[in-house]
A protein has these predicted regions:
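Carbohydrate transferase catalytic cores enriched for Leloir-type hexosyltransferases
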Residues: 1-371
């Protein structure tokens, strides 16, 4: 059993993919190891702790939520603190958000993506300077960097010119058991069961998540499909979300397009399981856990042919050009019109999803330490 220090300072209130990663890895590692968890006071109620006997929470003032203050703390205070604490290694699960210097013990970092290099205008000039000039300098000081896909690993080498030998591809897992359950709380979803629906689970962020091209694809579908299927979005509104919602308000099909907002874990499995198709049109993803969640829920998946999505989906998905609404429309229509294709995709998806787990992910982290 090892003693591991994990910084959860980059936790987003439990409402993002990074949040899910942090609490999933923390809980999995705590099954067999002792964890000291650094976390802001305001985040404690949002953090689902499953093995409390092995997790020691170290609370910090919410004042540290300010990005600059938080970075300075990781740079100067944490290294000093580590001189008086005995840990086997430090794990930073959101490496692009928290700077660090060379700590006096082994330090492992997970990098999720470099989406800012692929999505023009995602960040302002100040933040892009931080991303391009500051982050790579500190990543070079890590003992090992875990990239959650080959796509992310390739970006780290291409844009940051990091040594390939210190970057380990370590695929994300997901909570498979949660999505195998046929029962889940309704949480306002029941009204959509009266009509079939195409589902997209992602924060409403423009342009990165590419909701507009999916909406345009839906508008191009045959009338029969539009009459039979709604388009349902589940996710909190983020940067540019108002652009997506304004477009829908002016669409002829605004009554067919539903925004559920953030859907909590108790209702998410039912939302997936009752979908007829999962569409993932994002321009760029470091991994794409929703693909696995949909597959485990026995829902066929169509997704972008970019970044990590084809890598994660494998032969179980149909891909499209996310820049081409016509191509998105064609793939959606093809799957919805062909029952044999749908059933084949569902079977392939169930087997594909079984290849990914948090247990496997965390084992690789520990294995790297033991090397």
């Amino acid at each position: 059993m090892y003693k591991i220090l994990i910084s959860a300072m980059g936790y987003d209130g439990g409402k993002s993919g990074i949040s899910e990663y942090i609490h999933s890895v923390t809980n999995e590692l705590s099954k067999t190891h002792k964890i000291d968890l650094l976390i802001l006071k305001k985040e404690i109620t949002n953090f689902p702790i499953k093995n409390s006997e092995n997790i020691h929470i170290i609370k910090f003032s919410d004042y540290l939520a300010k990005p600059v203050i938080n970075m300075l703390w990781h740079l100067f205070i944490l290294p000093f603190t580590l001189k008086f604490k005995k840990y086997d290694f430090v794990f930073l699960p959101a490496g692009n958000r928290r700077l660090f210097c060379r700590y006096p013990i082994k330090t492992f970092i997970t990098m999720h993506d470099l989406s800012q290099y692929h999505i023009k205008g995602k960040y302002d000039k100040f933040r892009m300077f931080y991303v391009k000039k500051i982050i790579p300098r500190f990543l070079k000081k890590a003992d090992k960097i875990f990239a959650i896909s080959k796509s992310t690993r390739g970006d780290l080498v291409k844009f940051y010119r990091l040594n390939e030998n210190k970057i380990i591809v370590n695929y994300n897992g997901f909570n498979a058991d949660k999505f195998k359950k046929k029962e889940s709380k309704d949480n306002g979803i029941k009204k959509f069961k009266e009509k079939k629906y195409i589902l997209y689970v992602a924060r409403i962020e423009h342009p990165g998540k590419n909701h507009l091209n999916l909406i345009k694809a839906y508008e191009m579908l045959p009338e029969k499909i539009q009459a039979e299927y709604n388009l349902v979005f589940a996710g909190s509104s983020w940067n540019g979300g108002e652009i997506v919602k304004d477009y829908v308000m002016n669409s002829t099909f605004r009554n067919n397009i539903k925004f559920l907002g953030f859907v909590d874990d108790s209702a998410l499995p039912g939302l997936y399981r009752n979908a007829s198709l999962y569409a993932f049109p994002s321009f760029y993803e470091g991994f794409g856990i929703p693909i696995l969640e949909a597959m485990s829920s026995e829902v066929p998946v169509v997704c972008s042919n970019t970044s990590s999505l084809p890598e994660v989906g494998g032969e179980a998905v149909y891909t499209f050009d996310p820049n081409n609404p016509g191509d998105i429309k064609d793939k959606i229509e093809y799957v919805l019109k062909n029952d044999d294709i749908r059933l084949n995709m569902i079977e392939k998806g169930k087997f594909r999803a079984k290849e990914f787990s948090w247990k496997k992910h965390c084992k690789q982290i520990v294995d790297e330490y033991e090397k």
